[in-house]
Amino acid sequence: FDRSATGYMSRCFIQQDLSAVTAACLMMKKSVFEQVNGLDEENFKVAFNDVDLCMKIRKAGYLIVWTPYAEAYHYESISRGTEDTPEKQARFKGEAEAFMIKWEKELELGDPYYNQNLTLEREDFSIN
């Protein structure tokens, strides 16, 4: 987010629990990382590894807390590039399918931190 972005209901300015955060800026106790067996490098070599990690952490009973007090600059996909070749697209598709299968039950329940009255079809937080 841009530093001046307020987000929905000014949520960019408050600490809050989320289902997942990006591994580009992520911190946890080593013991928690080890307890959930870290990143799944076998099934999620590039995509979804951070979300999978967060899902495992939540399943173990911990919270994923986002804070506005940490700031980092992250240029998504600069080092790895985009999914612009058939091989990369196939890898991404495989990782997406593996994620959907692994977390099917949790995904069907919906995001506990997203208001179920708001649409998932657009990013404007309009009423469903």
Which sequence ranges carry the predicted segments?
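C-terminal, non-catalytic tails of nucleotide-sugar-dependent glycosyltransferases
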Residues: F1-L18, T22, M27, I64, ...
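Conserved active-site-proximal loop/helix segments of enzymes involved in bacterial cell-wall
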Residues: Y75-I78
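A short, conserved alpha-helix in the catalytic core of glycosyltransferases
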Residues: F13-N37, E42-Y73
